[in-house]
Amino acid sequence: MRSRSAILLASLASLPLSTLAEEKTGAEVYETVCSECHSTGKHDAPVFGDRKRWGKLVREGLNDLVPAALRGVRKMPAMGGNPTLTDLEVARGVIHMANAGGGKFAEPTAADAARWRKKADAGKKH
């Protein structure tokens, strides 16, 4: 029994970390990170579900919204203040909030996240 446990642990240790941990959904990212400010409007963050505030942001589009969330904007820190999130998870969180505010955005792809990261890295926090 002990040797089976050792083999199992050794096998798990050899897997990439991304295989061991499932990525969060947009709703999970919102609940665990974004809701701290976006549920109450802390620091003038647009409140989840506020179609008037989010409507303006939705019109800007994901090519502006996601890079801003990745690099940080105004009082919002980069990655929503949680550097353990992946770029794809941040994008999912943004899309979850934008869709609750009237957007109709689809699930992002890894290619989308890579493109948005490149744009975020090219810009500065504003």
Walk through the language-model features, giving the residues of each:
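Gly/Gly-Pro-rich "capping" loops immediately C-terminal to redox-active cysteine motifs
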Residues: 39-68, 77-80
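Extracytoplasmic/secreted envelope proteins and their assembly/folding machinery
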Residues: 66, 70, 91-94
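Sequence context surrounding c-type heme c attachment/ligation sites in exported
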Residues: 23-35, 55-66, 84, 106-107
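Bacterial N-terminal signal peptides that target proteins for export
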Residues: 1-8
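N-terminal signal peptide c-region/cleavage motif recognized by signal peptidases
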Residues: 16-21
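The canonical Cys-X-X-Cys-His
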Residues: 31-40, 93, 97
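Flexible coil segments in periplasmic/lumen-exposed cytochrome c-class electron-transfer proteins
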Residues: 80-126
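Conserved amphipathic alpha-helical interaction elements at protein-protein interfaces in regulatory
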Residues: 43, 75, 99-103
